[in-house]
């Protein structure tokens, strides 16, 4: 793929995008030779590009994005993040950022911030996972582990969940999670926000159970608090303590070095009462040359 091919790809994708958060170009899956370092998103009225590595084509790519921004006339701002630099700075290249920015998905709004941190507050590749939770949440008690900004929780409440418990050790992201519920007019009386280290808070988690639907969506690595390769099994080993008799589990992992066999083995060895149901498909807008290195959303069920 050359720069002209990339430009044409973006023009084609941009014609079909509306207000919903859309991945226009996904190079991270290595499906496009020479562009593994690049992603481009349309987030409501912002064109947002992330450069994960330094590359000689960077200046030309930013110039092409300026042209796309001007040509299409559908965005209010162009933001480019240099993820490879310390603190992952984002620069406003064109236009003016709205006072409040949102990711819109399946009629729900999530607050996002393009200039405050490495991550904007929303992971678009998890759309099918959120849809699954929304479709299966009716009347259920839901546990959302590593809840981040609580998008799963908002989806669950929108789907009729009886209650949701969100657990994340970062109070700031839980505050954004509260706001995400408020943005959508969702009743937070049904929602708990627990700012705790999950691996040290099992008694609190058990107290609010048992849960009918459990979401496990950890970072692959978080210095000092979680490493999927060694800590994921500590969660699986505890599931029987707070899972309802017919509990559904969405077990997610986005570590390229750990495949589906890793999660299946953890369940087989540590929670044999749960059987594997399926792996949810990933979005077509996130192509990959190796499915085992991409996002893995595995569904397990306790009981019949």
Segments predicted by a language model, with ranges:
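Conserved SAM-binding motif I beta-strand of class I
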Residues: 163-168
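Conserved SAM-binding loop of SAM-dependent methyltransferases across substrates and taxa
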Residues: 149-161
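S-adenosyl-L-methionine
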Residues: 169-215
């Amino acid at each position: 793929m050359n720069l002209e091919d990339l430009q044409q790809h973006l023009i084609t994708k941009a014609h079909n995008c509306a207000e919903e958060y859309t991945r226009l170009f996904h190079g991270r899956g290595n499906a496009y030779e020479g562009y593994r370092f690049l992603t481009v998103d349309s987030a409501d009225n912002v064109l947002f590009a992330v450069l994960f590595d330094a590359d000689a084509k960077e200046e030309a790519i930013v110039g092409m994005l300026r042209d796309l921004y001007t040509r299409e006339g559908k965005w209010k701002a162009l933001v480019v993040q240099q993820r490879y630099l310390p603190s992952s700075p984002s620069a406003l290249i064109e236009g003016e950022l709205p006072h409040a920015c949102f990711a819109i998905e399946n009629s729900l709004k999530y607050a996002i911030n393009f200039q405050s941190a490495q991550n904007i507050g929303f992971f678009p590749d998890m759309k099918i996972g959120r849809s699954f939770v929304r479709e299966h949440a009716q009347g259920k008690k839901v546990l959302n582990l590593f809840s981040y900004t609580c998008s799963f929780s908002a989806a669950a409440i929108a789907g009729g969940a009886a209650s949701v418990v969100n657990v994340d050790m970062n109070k700031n992201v839980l505050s954004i999670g509260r706001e995400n519920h408020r943005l959508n007019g969702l009743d937070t009386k049904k929602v708990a926000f627990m700012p705790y280290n999950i691996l040290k808070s099992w008694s609190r988690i058990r107290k609010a159970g048992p849960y009918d639907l459990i979401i496990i969506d950890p970072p692959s690595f978080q210095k000092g608090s979680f490493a999927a390769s060694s800590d994921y099994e500590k969660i699986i080993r505890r599931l029987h303590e707070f899972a309802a008799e017919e509990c559904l589990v969405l077990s997610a992992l986005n570590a390229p070095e750990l495949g589906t066999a890793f999660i299946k083995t953890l369940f087989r060895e540590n929670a044999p009462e749960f059987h594997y149901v399926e792996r949810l498909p990933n979005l077509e807008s996130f192509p990959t040359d190796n499915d085992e290195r991409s996002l893995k959303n595995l569904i397990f069920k306790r009981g019949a």
